[in-house]
Amino acid sequence: GSVIGCGETCLRGRCYTPGCTCDHGICKKN
């Protein structure tokens, strides 16, 4: 749920930062 350490825009649901998941177009961690 946090964008700290993530926050990248995720295209096609893919995040390149380890441990981050795509949530409504933004990569988030927990």
UniProtKB/Swiss-Prot annotation:
Gene Ontology BP annotations: defense response to bacterium
Disulfide pairings: C6-C20, C10-C22, C15-C27
Post-translational modification: Contains 3 disulfide bonds. This is a cyclic peptide.
Domain of life the protein comes from: Eukaryota
Keywords in alphabetical order: Antibiotic, Antimicrobial, Disulfide bond, Knottin, Plant defense
Domain notes for this protein: The presence of a 'disulfide through disulfide knot' structurally defines this protein as a knottin.
Protein name, per record: Cliotide T16
